[in-house]
Amino acid sequence: MGELPQSIRESIKNDIKNCEFLGFKDAAHLHQKEPFSVGIYRNQNKEMLVTCITEMPEVSPRMIDWWFGWHLNESERYQLWHPKAHISASLKEDNSHFETDKEKYLNMDSYVSEYIGNELNNLCISFVEPKQFGFSDLNDEKETAICAHVRDMSNNISVASITHLVSRNAEGSRMQSSFWLGMNPTHTNSILTSLIKPLLESRLAKNILITDDLARNLLIHCAEEMNHLVKFLPILFKDKTN
């Protein structure tokens, strides 16, 4: 997969920072208004924020939109992204009839199996409109925001919210990624949510479920897959869209 960037290696070694941070509904402010850096943060509620930056020379925001629409429904495509950690990917509905790249992933549920660290995870990644994360005025020519909520399929409980903001620069693009862990624990069954939410939101539960190792492994995983994507996406995009 190649060597991790220096900023990632340093963040993995550093202590996790105890501080308050904005939630996923304010992702636009976090990404666009404040200095954004690589790191792992824990707030007083024991929720965690993992942030990653990927420099993407020769990659455009449009390529990222295309990639997310293209890879969702075939495991072989998903495995290109992280050959060591990605196992399978599927959709329960066909997205091939949609015309635009964004339509092919927005409001879709992607079912994936992947390793984060040494643990195999079966997840449902539900892609949503960027407006849900506070991105109301994106310039489609210069930027795109991939936003999603993640559910653990072993218990049907939401475990994370994600955004990848991709912005044009002189070399290509820069991707800013954020993962919020434990901030919105819900079950697909609303009755069960009302019963278990107080437990899931307790500091004790979050201390057990949201570990330092999980956060560090997630940062490594994101850095590996995004830096690997940079290596082949420009050529793949040109080949498939020409």
Regions of interest found by a model, annotated:
Residues N45-L49, P61, N156-V159, R168-R174:
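Coil-to-beta-strand transition motifs
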Residues H86-I157:
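Glycine-rich portal/gate segments that line the openings of hydrophobic small-molecule binding cavities
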